[in-house]
Curated annotation (Swiss-Prot):
GO terms for biological process: defense response. This is Alpha-insect toxin BjaIT. The keyword Protein biosynthesis does not apply. The keyword Secreted applies. Gene3D superfamilies: Knottin, scorpion toxin-like. Expressed by the venom gland. It comes from the Eukaryota.
Length: 85
């Protein structure tokens, strides 16, 4: 019985945990993807591993793409200046 617990624990550690988050997708300069349509954002978000995405009109960063369940490896917009503009 103890072996079963140890094996299950080892498998859990080996598989890793992939989490996601809802956020504004950003480029490498901390600039949110600007948008005009939901289809553009959905394409960009899903291309980067999110479940879906839409254009957030007049949001915190203007008209920007909001992604649902975006992987941790994809950069998101963080507070501070957009260094590209």
């Amino acid at each position: 019985m103890n072996y079963l617990v140890v094996i299950c624990f080892a498998l859990l550690l080996m598989t890793g945990v992939e989490s996601g988050r809802d956020a504004y997708i950003a480029d490498n300069l901390n600039c949110a993807y600007t948008c005009g349509s939901n289809s553009y954002c959905n394409t960009e978000c899903t291309k980067n591993g999110a479940v879906s995405g839409y254009c957030q009109w007049l949001g915190k960063y203007g008209n920007a793409c909001w992604c649902i369940n975006l992987p941790d490896k994809v950069p998101i917009r963080i507070p501070g200046a957009c260094r590209g503009r």
